[in-house]
Amino acid sequence: MVKQIESKAAFQEALDDAGDKLVVVDFSATWCGPCKMIKPFFHSLSEKYSNVVFLEVDVDDCQDVASECEVKCMPTFQFFKKGQKVGEFSGANKEKLEATINELV
């Protein structure tokens, strides 16, 4: 399951609630073509990796979160463990997304 993040407080709460689990955050926008292309794959990964927390942040709805996380383009995927960022890349690269999850989980 992918959790939609609606606010900075909800983002921080989701990171805190994850504990030791890997958190994968998809920063995207409704007008972004590559974001739309990778979204179904991102959701399928959330079914496959039940021990990983998947979050979605719409950069237009949560500009403060995107700004704090220094997101420059979409889609950007960031990876967190224990509240600390442990990885990041930009672009709709399915292979890299799954490989990074496997590397960090």
Swiss-Prot record:
One of its GO terms (cellular component) is extracellular region. In the fully reduced protein, both Cys-69 and Cys-73 are nitrosylated in response to nitric oxide (NO). When two disulfide bonds are present in the protein, only Cys-73 is nitrosylated. Cys-73 can serve as donor for nitrosylation of target proteins. The keyword Nucleotide-binding does not apply. It is found in: Nucleus; Cytoplasm; Secreted. The modification N6-acetyllysine is found at residues 3, 39, 94. Disulfide bonds join 32-35. Keywords: Acetylation, Activator, Cytoplasm, Disulfide bond, Electron transport, Nucleus, Redox-active center, S-nitrosylation, Secreted, Transcription, Transcription regulation, Transport. Coiled coil: none annotated. The modification S-nitrosocysteine is found at residues 62, 69, 73. The record marks 33-34 as: Contributes to redox potential value. GO terms for molecular function: protein-disulfide reductase activity. The modification N6-succinyllysine is found at residues 8, 94. Residues 3-105 form the Thioredoxin domain. The record marks 26 as: Deprotonates C-terminal active site Cys. InterPro entries: Thioredoxin, Thioredoxin-like_sf, Thioredoxin_CS, Thioredoxin_domain. The active site is at residues 32, 35. One of its GO terms (biological process) is positive regulation of DNA binding. Participates in various redox reactions through the reversible oxidation of its active center dithiol to a disulfide and catalyzes dithiol-disulfide exchange reactions. Plays a role in the reversible S-nitrosylation of cysteine residues in target proteins, and thereby contributes to the response to intracellular nitric oxide. Nitrosylates the active site Cys of CASP3 in response to nitric oxide (NO), and thereby inhibits caspase-3 activity. Belongs to the thioredoxin family. Homodimer; disulfide-linked. Interacts with TXNIP through the redox-active site. Interacts with MAP3K5 and CASP3. Interacts with APEX1; the interaction stimulates the FOS/JUN AP-1 DNA-binding activity in a redox-dependent manner. This is Thioredoxin. The lineage of its organism: Eukaryota, Metazoa, Chordata, Craniata, Vertebrata.
